[in-house]
Amino acid sequence: VSAKPAKXXVTAGEQAIAMT
């Protein structure tokens, strides 16, 4: 992921939401 969230880590669920 080129643009990662400020949390630092991204879970599979959050990644799926971001890709929606």
From Swiss-Prot:
Pathway: Energy metabolism; oxidative phosphorylation. Transmembrane segments: none annotated. Belongs to the cytochrome c oxidase VIII family. Keywords: Membrane, Mitochondrion, Mitochondrion inner membrane. Its main location: mitochondrion. It is a single-pass membrane protein. The keyword Cytoplasm does not apply. It comes from the Eukaryota. This is Cytochrome c oxidase subunit 8B, mitochondrial. It is found in: Mitochondrion inner membrane. One of its GO terms (cellular component) is mitochondrial inner membrane. The keyword Mitochondrion applies.
